[in-house]
């Protein structure tokens, strides 16, 4: 029986959200860093578009095993312990990115950075959702996840305000700050009360396909894959696409800043609306907004118009992604929650890895920006349908509502 008072529970929740927000902030900065530094990296290492696609995808490839293994280890050894190790890992390899000396070393540094980033996210979600409990879980996860687009906006600010800085600058920031956070997390981050109160064993992956969770697992995987395909294509390729459309690098960084501000706004707005709107309305809002914004990004020619298109793209693309992160913990019990979230994130990372590679291939074939954006439309429609079914069925397929 819990002995925590309401005030102590509230303090624990706020401390957890605050510290996890800071980690999410640095995760967002590092995820955006390669896109912001792309021009400098390509020039410094004389890389073509396909090679840059591999730079982008190496980091995303690392996210996949990181999310899968990080979630499983967290259900066995604790969310806090694995999160701290993850933060140390992506901080160290962000620094390694800044001192890379050739293409292979750069790819390896981005790969290992991705492993750390991937392992961190399911633990951020699990810690926050379990500290909040069922009633405030969606809101708490949305507040925490706001750190990701805000961190990405900070990276864009470095690109916009520091156009004359070395390309390594964003990676120095993305490495030093996480390493400073490590001792703070060790001292102040509470372990999940749900995890601490249970005897843990490594959950088998087949537990995700038990009768009460199989439908949710498959639907989550489907919508994660296609939504993250679009999000990471935008994060990695949009700055270079804008420059090819005739915008200045500083203007491209400004559009990325607008995109991430839209993402932060969408994370809060869509998270708050998740339990208030009908499923069909929510699904139509998110995915029709994504389609419209991609069309605008491929066709708008004015800088002000592109700023607006970037903001709307962030609002619905990353905002929609945050809704998925808030939804996922609802469908799994505490014994398999980090594993369930981690595997969904890992499948999403497959989409995230595919997006930059697909865009690079299409650009190499000469399809241009419009072709890249148009190719994303079928995936958005599939993801929208999966989210609609998932949200419609969640009251029937949610196995439990533990804290």
UniProtKB/Swiss-Prot annotation:
Protein keywords: Cell inner membrane, Cell membrane, Membrane, Symport, Transmembrane, Transmembrane helix, Transport
Segments passing through the bilayer: 17-37, 54-74, 82-102, 106-126, 143-163, 165-185, 218-238, 254-274, 280-300, 307-327, 340-360, 370-390
Catalytic activities: 3-(3-hydroxyphenyl)propanoate(in) + H(+)(in) = 3-(3-hydroxyphenyl)propanoate(out) + H(+)(out)
Pfam families with a match to the protein in the record: MFS_1
Any single GO CC term annotated in Swiss-Prot or TrEMBL for this entry: membrane
Residues exposed to the Cytoplasmic side: 1-16, 75-81, 127-142, 186-217, 275-279, 328-339, 391-403
Compartment annotation: Cell inner membrane
Family membership: Belongs to the major facilitator superfamily. Aromatic acid:H(+) symporter (AAHS) (TC 2.A.1.15) family.
Protein name: 3-(3-hydroxy-phenyl)propionate transporter
Protein's organism: Escherichia coli (strain K12)
Gene that this sequence comes from: mhpT
């Amino acid at each position: 029986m819990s002995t925590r008072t309401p005030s102590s529970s509230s303090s624990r929740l706020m401390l957890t959200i605050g510290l996890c927000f800071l980690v999410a902030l640095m995760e967002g900065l590092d995820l955006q860093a390669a896109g912001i530094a792309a021009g400098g990296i390509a020039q410094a290492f004389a890389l073509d578009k396909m090679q840059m696609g591999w730079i982008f995808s190496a980091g995303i490839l690392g996210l996949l095993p990181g999310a899968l293994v990080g979630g499983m280890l967290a259900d066995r050894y604790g969310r806090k312990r694995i999160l701290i190790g993850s933060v140390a890992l992506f901080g160290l390899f962000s620094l390694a990115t800044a001192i890379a000396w050739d293409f292979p070393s750069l790819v390896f540094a981005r790969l290992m950075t991705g492993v750390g980033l991937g392992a961190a996210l399911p633990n951020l979600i699990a810690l926050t959702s379990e500290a909040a409990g069922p009633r405030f879980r969606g809101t708490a996860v949305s507040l925490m996840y706001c750190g990701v687009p805000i961190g990405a906006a900070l990276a864009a600010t470095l690109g916009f305000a520091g156009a004359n800085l070395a390309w390594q600058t964003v990676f120095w920031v993305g490495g030093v700050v996480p390493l400073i956070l490590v001792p703070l997390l060790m001292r102040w981050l509470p372990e999940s009360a749900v995890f601490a109160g249970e005897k843990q064993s490594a959950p088998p992956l087949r537990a995700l396909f038990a009768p009460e969770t199989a439908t949710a697992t498959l639907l989550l995987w489907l919508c994660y894959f296609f939504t993250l395909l679009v999000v990471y294509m935008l994060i990695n390729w949009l700055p270079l696409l804008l420059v090819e459309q005739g915008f200045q690098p500083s203007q491209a960084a400004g559009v990325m800043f607008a995109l991430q501000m839209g993402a932060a706004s969408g994370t809060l707005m869509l998270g708050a609306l998740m339990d208030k709107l009908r499923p069909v309305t929510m699904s139509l809002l998110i995915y029709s907004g994504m389609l419209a914004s991609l069309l605008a990004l491929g066709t708008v020619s004015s800088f002000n118009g592109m700023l607006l298109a970037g903001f709307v793209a962030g609002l619905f693309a990353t905002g929609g992604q945050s809704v998925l992160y808030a939804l996922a913990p609802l469908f799994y019990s505490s014994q398999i929650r980090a594993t369930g979230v981690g595997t969904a994130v890992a499948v999403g990372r497959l989409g995230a890895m595919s997006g930059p590679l697909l865009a690079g291939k299409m650009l190499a074939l000469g399809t241009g920006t419009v072709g890249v954006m148009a190719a994303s439309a079928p995936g958005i429609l599939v993801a929208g349908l999966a989210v609609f079914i998932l949200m419609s069925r969640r009251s029937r397929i949610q196995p439990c509502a533990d804290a």
